[in-house]
């Protein structure tokens, strides 16, 4: 969206595929700060990943999927994909299908009851990576709870700050648990790239 870490209007409009989205999402991704570049600096490549887990399909979360298209699979909630493909024209613009084209996208459905909505998906069946529905911002918005072997966990709550009151209450309760190492929301300018070891 920002070639060489510099704001460029035409590149952003082309990337977003929509002039209206451009007016609401003028983001500058600094040089070497794209997801594939950050992980390459740590010696990790998308081809090494078992999965990319999508919190939802809004443009600011799905527009860079081609950067991680070599991952073994890209997972998104079945209802979220249905919402993006069959929702209103606004949904189809803000969740542009071109961003998913050419990726190994697969859908998942709930297999657990974690969270205020009682809907979750245990990615590997071992409780270590659990996608938790936190509806509000979008129908299929998910947080990711990452749990270490000692029970400590990190909660990545995506755009949960725009969720329903029940979802926000669940996020707050999780953040106050003794074993919660971090509760991280997207779009928080105080959060800097880094690594958390569990």
What is each residue range found by the language model?
Residues 1, 7-9, 60-63, 83-85, ...:
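Short catalytic/ligand-binding loop motif for oxyanion handling, primarily in non-cytosolic enzymes
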Residues 57-63, 138-142, 184, 188-193:
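Active-site environment of divalent metal-dependent phosphoester hydrolases
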Residues 15-20, 24-75:
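Active-site metal-binding motif and surrounding structural segment of the metallo-beta-lactamase
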Residues 1-2, 50-56, 76-77, 133-136, ...:
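Active-site neighborhood of phospho(di)ester-bond hydrolases with catalytic His/Asp-centered motifs
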């Amino acid at each position: 969206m920002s070639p060489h870490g510099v704001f460029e209007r035409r590149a952003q409009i082309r990337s977003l595929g929509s002039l209206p989205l451009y007016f609401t999402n003028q983001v500058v991704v600094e040089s070497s700060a794209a997801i594939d570049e950050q992980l390459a600096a740590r010696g990790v490549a998308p081809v090494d990943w078992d999965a990319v887990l999508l919190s939802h399909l809004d443009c600011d979360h799905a527009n860079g999927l081609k950067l991680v298209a070599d991952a073994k699979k890209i997972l998104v909630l079945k209802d979220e994909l249905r919402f993006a493909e069959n929702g209103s024209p606004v949904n189809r613009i803000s969740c542009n299908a071109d961003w998913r084209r050419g990726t190994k996208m697969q859908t998942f459905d709930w297999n657990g009851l974690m969270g205020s909505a009682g809907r979750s998906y245990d990615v590997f069946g071992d409780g270590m990576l659990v996608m938790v529905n936190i509806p509000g911002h979008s129908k299929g918005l998910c947080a990711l709870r990452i749990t270490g072997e000692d029970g400590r966990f990190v909660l990545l709550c995506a755009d949960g700050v725009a969720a329903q009151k029940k979802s926000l209450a669940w996020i707050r309760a999780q953040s106050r648990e003794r074993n919660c190492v971090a509760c991280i929301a997207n779009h928080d300018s105080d959060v800097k790239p880094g690594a958390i070891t569990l």
